């Protein structure tokens, strides 16, 4: 049975590299068909919504509009790419999913968790990842890494305190959900890769029927 695995984390945590690590590990363990996605974005329409969220505009984007754009982009991706792939036996590895909205818009922006939960239930129902790997990093270190990549986007331009609140919410959410595994992303890249592979090995051991044999 195909699975949906998600990588989460702050800016500079190494999510793109982690997506590759996961895909490579799965390929090495008999998973032939894997599709990688990102949020916001992942489809032509969802990418247009991503641009609105990420780019700096003359007009202020309200936090409520930001939240709704995130979920609009997300449900477009889920319904047009992720669910069809899973139904076709394709594993999906995602760079961000719903946990990002709970952490960024909920923790960082301070939007009420009940409102976010209501929107989530309305558009996603009970759909959720099978496994989430949260890459935990000191926000100051993550932002430093992001700056080294070049020009910052609208969200990356937020104050450090925003990312501290976001990280705190991530950790709270991880502590309450056993399907979310915390990976120390402040380690050297090879150590992060080893930790991700260990988490995958543990998950696949408990779900042996999902690996072709």
UniProtKB/Swiss-Prot annotation:
Keyword terms: ATP-binding, Kinase, Nucleotide biosynthesis, Nucleotide-binding, Transferase
Pfam families cross-referenced by the UniProt entry: Thymidylate_kin (PF02223)
Root EC class: transferase
Any GO BP annotation: dTTP biosynthetic process
GO cellular component: cytosol
CDD domains according to UniProt: TMPK
Primary role: Phosphorylation of dTMP to form dTDP in both de novo and salvage pathways of dTTP synthesis.
Protein name: Thymidylate kinase
